[in-house]
Design a protein with these regions (language model features):
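Multi-pass alpha-helical transporter architecture, strongest
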Residues: 35-43, 118-145
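Conserved short cytoplasmic inter-helical helices of the MFS fold
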Residues: 47, 78-82, 113
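C-terminal transmembrane helical hairpin of 12-TM major facilitator-type secondary transporters
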Residues: 20-67
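Interfacial helix-cap and linker-helix signal at transmembrane-aqueous boundaries
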Residues: 8-9, 13, 102-110
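Transmembrane alpha-helices of Major Facilitator/SLC transporters
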Residues: 1-13, 30
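Alpha-helical transmembrane segments of multi-pass secondary-active solute transporters
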Residues: 26, 83, 105, 114-118
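A late C-terminal transmembrane helix in Major Facilitator Superfamily
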Residues: 2, 72-108
């Protein structure tokens, strides 16, 4: 998924799409293609369940390829590492908080709500990119006017 997402973004840029359009297209495509993984909750075949989960994981990594480049796209070389450190720490902290919730959901209900929550968090993250980063562009091209 990561290779395909990076390749797709590069091809879109090479074809004349803006950095903003190519990154957001890859982010949205990945976010949307995670959702069909929910089908694994409704089928009995373990093979199809594995196929759907694999497709959702592929889509996750497809999306991540564009997300991983955002600090490099938006910040100077000097600041990009710090931004990644902060986002990595925030992600680890979020995982730490969410782990007991997952355990509780699985113990009291099932894996179903976990799959639903995780699927729609991808849509939420794409929406947050749209909201908080209206235009993805290289640091050297940011206008201050």
């Amino acid at each position: 998924g990561s290779f395909a997402g990076g390749w797709t973004s590069s091809k879109l840029i090479a074809s004349g799409k803006s950095l903003d359009a190519s990154r957001k297209w890859v982010i949205w495509l990945g976010a949307i293609f995670v959702v069909p993984g929910l089908g694994c909750l409704y089928i009995e075949s373990p093979y199809w369940a594995i196929a759907l989960i694999s497709f959702a994981l592929f889509a996750t990594q497809f999306k991540q390829a564009a997300l991983f480049t955002l600090p490099i796209d938006l910040f100077s070389k000097k600041d990009a590492a710090s931004v990644w450190g902060i986002t990595g720490s925030a992600g680890s902290f979020g995982a730490m908080l969410f782990t007991p919730v997952i355990g509780w959901l699985v113990d009291t209900i099932s894996y179903s709500p976990v799959f639903v929550i995780v699927s729609f968090l991808h849509i939420l993250s794409a929406l947050m990119v749209m909201l908080f980063i209206p235009k993805i562009q290289y640091v050297g091209t940011i206008s201050t006017t």
